Amino acid sequence: MSNILEVKNVFKQYGDYTALNKVSLSVPQGSIYGLLGPNGAGKTSLIRIINQITMPDSGEIILDGAVLKPEDVQYIGYMPEERGLYKSMKVGEQCLYLAQLKGLSKHDAKTQLDYWFDRLEIQGWWNKKIQELSKGMAQKIQFVVTVLHKPKLLILDEPFSGFDPVNANLIKDEIIELNKQGTSVIFSTHRMESVEEMCDHIALIHKSNKLIEGKLTDVKKQFRTNSYEVGILSDNIEGLMYDLSQKFTLTQTDFKSLNDELKLEINLGNATPNELLNTLILRGQVTHFMEKIPSVNDIFIKTVTE
């Protein structure tokens, strides 16, 4: 698979502070790529360099196979965490202006705006001023001006900030639909549940360094702990616990009195899943048996606290 974006050994320093320490990333064409990290990790510095707001001290950015050039701004859609709409301008006037900055003719801009205003059901906002809109309403306008020029690469920094759950879900669906149509997406957020739902690749930056990068499924495999979540109905709990203790490590126990189901989290150690399952079957009725796959949140916390 080719890459829509390659970041090669990017180094950025502000005075004595190193914001990015020779960071390299590869964003596959057509992916939704989660850029993760705690506050101050270097994510925003990297995003600003990709958008040519600031320049790296060394290293280079490759967009769609060629070194990034100033005119490539037309191929990128960027929605920063700090939204940047002019509060005193009318919505329609501002959208037309920003669209033309991205290279669209006035006619094409109006066509795209009509499409998006209709799609998001905001037709009545055209003559309103930004200052008359709620934060969530202004967020919708910011999203529209970010995507209306049909960018190859969409960079979204905390895109769900300010949205209620209904509108957050609406924007999420629009991002997924744009991706299905071929737009590659870089998605920076602290909402780990959104990363789980949407991203197929992730990278984690911490203290100016890239610590993790890869397909989400592969990264999760790297962090597996060989633990299983099981549920069992047994009339001999004491015998079951003894049998399990001979070969496995119990890391969590939860007894559900409603149906007398015992829920366990068990680390296999050097044993196999079949050995665990056979041990359980001998002592009761197995109701649940599943490997515990780490969540993105688990991986994030483990990586930044080690």
Regions found by a protein language model. Name each.
Residues 76-77, 117, 220, 297-301:
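Conserved protein kinase catalytic domain
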